[in-house]
Amino acid sequence: MYKQVKRINDIGRYIYIDGLIYGIKEEEGKRYFQELSLGGEVLWQSKESNVYDYYANEEVIIFNLKTTEGIFDVLIYDRKTKKIIFKGEIELYLFSPRFYDKNILYNINKNRVLTFDILKGGILQEKEISLKGITAFFTYDYIVRYDDIYIYIYVKNDFSLLWQQNIQDFFPGEEELSIFEIYSYKDTFIIIARVGIVCLSQKDGHLLWRLNKGAFTMEIVGNLGYVCTGLSLYWVNLDNGEKYGYGRKYDRLPDFEYNGETYWPAGYRVVYHKGLLWYRVYSSGESFILVIDPETANYQWIHKVETYEKVMDIKFYDDKMFVTDTGYNLFIYEEE
């Protein structure tokens, strides 16, 4: 399957673009933005040593600086030439990819919406308006936002509220309901709400189907959604809401053995890659990656990650697998 070829420590949140790694290096109370090779070599480092939030895409690097007065100065560099495109004093929140719709940054707080062009370094629109919830993602027409039990759909061009829906209406009496994730599928929204899943029309929010089955996360592959709930795995036909399992009680994944020890398959997310489901597990103080056959839910590969921390994320780039843990370490694997 894969073998580990590099470990980069203390990198925190990273961004991968064109075979390069971008992130923060903390050193003696200073924070630099760096561009690294896959071998961990520093190819470029910011002159600024007080970098706070940051983001990068194929064209630009953008970060802001933390000063005693606050977080204001924003710098935008051409990612390839490292020439400064923009430098200005403006308060922007940069840290989450959820804030970006291609090259447009949306800063939405309680009473204001500001849109900013990160390629040119200019404010496109600033409007005094209050939007409910937090941003999940953008579609071509909509801003999708949510809070604990509500989903809010705003029209992107004027920030008007198109519709909102209390998900509790579909699960009356379920006190543990909470929106965990929202996905866009065709012309619908799939909402993972802990105690169940609902599919709503993007146009007006009417209910298309509902599944009364616990759900934490979903990985969408074609018209199928692979759902995890902590120890179990099942899949759903997203066109009609029909649920399928693997013939096991409560859809529970089987325990697994490693070096003569038995472990619970305690995880909450699968990632689809090359026809298989990659499942991160933290059990008895150990972190593992289990590779699951989606047809049978049988294990195809069991790998122990060399860390005492919890594995947080698995991503695939070209022939590489990137794994991060709660200790801000990045493990790089190559396909064998």
Locations of the language-model features?
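Short loop/turn segments that connect beta-strands within beta-propeller blades
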Residues: 37-39, 78-82, 117-121, 155-159, ...
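Structural motif
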Residues: 28-34, 69-76, 111-115, 148-153, ...
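Blade-level signature of beta-propeller repeat domains, shared across WD40, Kelch, NHL, RCC1
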Residues: 306-336
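N-terminal "mature head" segments of proteins
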Residues: 1-90, 117, 125-127, 327-330
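A short beta-strand motif characteristic of beta-propeller blades
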Residues: 2-8, 40-46, 83-89, 122-128, ...
